[in-house]
Amino acid sequence: MSFSVDVLANIAIELQRGIGHQDRFQRLITTLRQVLECDASALLRYDSRQFIPLAIDGLAKDVLGRRFALEGHPRLEAIARAGDVVRFPADSELPDPYDGLIPGQESLKVHACVGLPLFAGQNLIGALTLDGMQPDQFDVFSDEELRLIAALAAGALSNALLIEQLESQNMLPGEAAPFEAVKQTQMIGLSPGMTQLKKEIEIVAASDLNVLISGETGTGKELVAKAIHEASPRAVNPLVYLNCAALPESVAESELFGHVKGAFTGAISNRSGKFEMADNGTLFLDEIGELSLALQAKLLRVLQYGDIQRVGDDRSLRVDVRVLAATNRDLREEVLAGRFRADLFHRLSVFPLSVPPLRERGDDVILLAGYFCEQCRLRLGLSRVVLSAGARNLLQHYNFPGNVRELEHAIHRAVVLARATRSGDEVILEAQHFAFPEVTLPPPEVAAVPVVKQNLREATEAFQRETIRQALAQNHHNWAACARMLETDVANLHRLAKRLGLKD
């Protein structure tokens, strides 16, 4: 089989038709799955010896949240090392990273696998993976044809990463540094709330404004602070962390501003405070609402004038520090109650950010669950950790009052429980492995029984027609995948579809 000009043109058109990088990537993957008639396809970005999924088709949704470290996935490592098309034989002993992650085929292992490394110049920037359940599924495509596909994908990914790099550095195209993948803290989530938060982080990171990050406990406020710092001009300098809630009143001032020898009992030497440590960098003050009013006044002075005084010292030190503060309280209410200074609140909240709770993030819970499953797999040396359909359903309907932190702990506990009840190094998480309070799941949809107005032959054909339509919709009109889903021969399916008027 060879690709026609029309097929390649269609792929190129789909890449241009999308609105934004994510949409283009998804169109590419969906189109490739249809053209190649494979069971699953994925576009991965390479960063720091791991592959990060950008778009998937035919795979469980939690794959988008997983981070595939090369040392834990020998097939992906082989793709990263190769400079060309990689075809894995059906009897390869190397485990496939997507085993158990193809919906409807969880109990089966991938038999056909092709990896296409993607390059920008000499730099590896990503990979395309194509998977099928039939051993010889991709034999009809030559390496040259697959290289054409890889070239189109590499061009799209390279352009997206270059634009991202230029935007993060606030550079014009003519001023671009040599290409390299942009490294930043991974913030997992595609929900509208997280998409908006990421945009706001990109905007404020390039400035030097103070930022107030608000959100419930466990939502990931520290991760937001790291993302801001890493995307800012101060990224080459330290990010210093201080939990204000853990500061005893007796040492809080010393922790913030430092002290000199003899300033108080136990001060046996000079000591720098967090502001000095963060000079030319960023200071993250977690739980800022827990600071006493006296310390709030001293913090305000630093923000106003940029100088500090060590405890016991009359001299002032100039510091250049960007302050990121976080709180799980409503500081406006705290100001009205007299527990937080209004002037400090306004100094800190020049650019406020709000981190949405997990219950408002929709399918992000599944992406995050995939991320934590992969972490557990590596930590415990397992070959795979996957979520059953029942577990996914439970996670999507639980409220998560403890937010992302609660989800992380729940996944870790479930993996340990599932591992204890199953021999081998493969773990499938079921709903019973999660110790959540009672969750009311939506009842399964029951189709209404229609009044019979057809003879048996007409009713049978109507049922067959609707079943094929649904299977085609679920498989993006991929006839080969549809045939496998319906457990019939693809040639017989084509003949039946023609008889039923579904094909010309």
Swiss-Prot record:
UniProt-listed SMART domains: AAA, GAF
Entry GO MF terms: ATP binding; ATP hydrolysis activity; DNA binding; DNA-binding transcription factor activity
Keywords: ATP-binding, DNA-binding, Nucleotide-binding, Phosphoprotein, Transcription, Transcription regulation
Pfam families listed in its UniProt record: GAF, Sigma54_activat
Superkingdom of source: Bacteria
Residues given in the record as ATP binding sites: 215-222, 278-287
Gene Ontology BP, a term: phosphorelay signal transduction system
Known pathway: Nitrogen metabolism; nitric oxide reduction
Domain Sigma-54 factor interaction span(s) in chain numbering: 187-416
DNA-binding region: 479-498
Keyword Manganese: no
Residue list for modification 4-aspartylphosphate: 57
Entry-linked PANTHER family: ANAEROBIC NITRIC OXIDE REDUCTASE TRANSCRIPTION REGULATOR NORR, TRANSCRIPTIONAL REGULATORY PROTEIN
Protein role: Required for the expression of anaerobic nitric oxide (NO) reductase, acts as a transcriptional activator for at least the norVW operon. Activation also requires sigma-54.
Descriptive protein name: Anaerobic nitric oxide reductase transcription regulator NorR
Native organism: Escherichia coli O6:H1 (strain CFT073 / ATCC 700928 / UPEC)
Lineage: Bacteria, Pseudomonadati, Pseudomonadota, Gammaproteobacteria, Enterobacterales
